[in-house]
């Protein structure tokens, strides 16, 4: 069973115990890892459970259409050099899965959290991440996450609500650039991959035109006013001569 953190309220301590019991039962009955049910039970008992549970953690939130799990593992591995890390590396990336990951983070003060794109604002509101990692956006599983423009807005909301956080963002994807651009501290990275097939129209106005050195914006119609950021940001970190 998971040890109850001392900083939790009485209600959340009950929720923690119930969630741990639900997870244990799920695994004992062969109904799965319990990565979701434990968090769901805890949240039903204490709606403020995630906020209380996450308070002692310094967290990194990783999101995007592709590469979330791999990147989260890489972040976890890097953070482990400084001590134990809580992480949902098995892909339970909605709110309940994040809760379970933190519940299992014995002796950890850091967390590497994979988060579903549409859950970023809600999770970030409770976790208060120090770093967001925004990978890419594309039309994947639209029945689950909705139109790509709606997803971009969710990521923009998530980052904008935490101006003190650092956003590590893929500057090759115009949709990710739009989602991250308002934050004061953005680290632009480029991997050289052909992201952006779903970003012919830029969410803040204009159309995306592509060239050998990246992308830039052009008016979608005569007289259209373009946003301040009109082209691919210059990356601070990038990969060269690497087959991806």
Predicted regions and their residues:
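Phosphate-binding loop of NTP-binding sites
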Residues: 2-211, 221, 225, 229
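Gly/Thr-rich phosphate-binding beta-strand-loop-beta motif of the actin/hexokinase/Hsp70
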Residues: 214
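Long, charge-rich boundary regions
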Residues: 223-244
């Amino acid at each position: 069973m998971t040890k109850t953190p001392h900083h939790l309220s009485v209600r959340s301590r009950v929720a923690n115990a119930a969630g741990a019991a639900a997870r244990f039962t799920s695994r004992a009955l062969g109904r799965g890892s319990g990565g979701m049910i434990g968090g769901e039970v805890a949240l039903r008992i204490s709606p403020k459970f995630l906020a209380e549970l996450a308070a002692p953690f310094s967290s990194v939130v990783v999101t995007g259409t592709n590469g979330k799990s791999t990147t989260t593992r890489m972040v976890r591995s890097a953070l482990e050099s400084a001590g134990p890390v809580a992480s949902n590396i098995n892909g339970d990336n909605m709110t309940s899965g994040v809760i379970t990951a933190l519940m299992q983070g014995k002796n950890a003060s850091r967390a590497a959290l994979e988060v579903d794109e549409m859950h970023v604002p809600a999770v970030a509101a409770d976790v208060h991440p120090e770093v967001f990692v925004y990978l890419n956006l594309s039309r994947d599983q639209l029945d689950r996450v909705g139109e790509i423009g709606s997803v971009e807005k969710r990521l923009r909301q998530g980052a904008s609500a935490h101006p003190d956080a650092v956003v590590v963002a893929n500057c090759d994807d115009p949709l990710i650039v739009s989602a991250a651009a308002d934050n004061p501290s953005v680290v632009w990275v480029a991997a050289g991959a052909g992201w952006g097939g779903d970003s012919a129209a830029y969410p803040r106005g204009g159309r995306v035109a592509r060239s050998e050195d990246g992308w830039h914006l052009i008016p979608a119609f005569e007289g259209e006013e373009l946003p301040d950021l009109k082209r691919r940001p210059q990356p601070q970190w990038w990969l060269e001569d690497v087959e991806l």
